[in-house]
């Protein structure tokens, strides 16, 4: 979970419009989220208790949570603890070690960042690579799911020479639509460009045998 799990555009927020909102309180939105994710949480809990592994690698919070003034960092940590999840704030590094029979087959570094601000999605993804070294960069703030695979140079000690490696940049997306029936909502009023993205997944695959990382959505 990369943040903005909850909408939290509540009364008092300049974007709030009563006719456009079905769930008006934190409790209602939290209950809806828990209900939709119940099956996933049960599977995650089973993996943790029986195999010591996390099905859900992490949960972050996004601007919809940390700017809401109704959810604190303590609330997020407590919620994650209750559900056997790891809370990673808004930015974090993850070190992935894929093993087979106790032997390390592939190690990759992931930089996960909820994201902030507006602008073009590709530029936002490229900005993640500034001052941060990783193999996979993931964000979710912008309402435009997309993925990019590219090569980057590095010095390979095993070859004692320069080399190149793959990098994956993914905006897993916060799904939205800028049009609603019978109500003129905030996203229709804010500008000329309408946004829409359907719910779905963006998949990153790690092939330890071929030492390849790929993405598709």
Regions found by a protein language model. Give the residues of each.
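Polar, enzyme-active/binding microenvironments
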Residues: 217
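Conserved beta-sheet core of the metallophosphoesterase superfamily
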Residues: 1, 106-110, 115-213
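Short helix-terminating capping/connector loops at secondary-structure junctions
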Residues: 46-54, 105, 161-165
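Short regulatory "switch" loops immediately downstream of catalytic or recognition motifs
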Residues: 38-47, 93-101, 142-156
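Short, well-ordered helical secondary-structure segments
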Residues: 81, 97-100, 127, 191
């Amino acid at each position: 979970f990369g943040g903005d799990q909850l909408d939290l555009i509540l009364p008092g927020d300049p974007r709030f419009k009563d006719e456009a909102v079905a769930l008006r309180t934190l409790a209602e939105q939290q209950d809806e989220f828990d209900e939709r994710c119940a099956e996933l949480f049960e599977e995650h809990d089973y993996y943790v208790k029986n195999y010591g592994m996390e099905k859900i690698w992490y949960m972050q919070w996004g601007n919809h949570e940390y700017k809401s003034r109704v959810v604190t960092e303590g609330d997020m940590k407590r919620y994650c603890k209750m559900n056997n999840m790891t809370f990673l704030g808004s930015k974090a590094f993850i070190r992935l070690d894929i093993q087979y029979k106790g032997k390390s087959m592939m190690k990759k570094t992931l930089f996960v960042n909820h994201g902030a601000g507006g602008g073009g999605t590709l530029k936002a993804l490229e900005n993640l690579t500034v001052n941060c070294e990783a193999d996979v960069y993931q964000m979710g703030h912008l309402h435009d799911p997309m993925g990019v695979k590219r090569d980057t140079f590095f010095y390979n000690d095993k070859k004692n020479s320069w080399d190149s490696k793959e990098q994956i940049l993914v905006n897993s997306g916060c799904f939205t639509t800028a049009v609603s029936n019978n109500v003129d909502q905030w996203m229709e009023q804010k500008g000329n460009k309408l946004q829409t993205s359907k719910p779905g997944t963006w998949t990153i695959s790690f092939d330890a045998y071929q030492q390849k990382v790929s993405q598709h959505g």
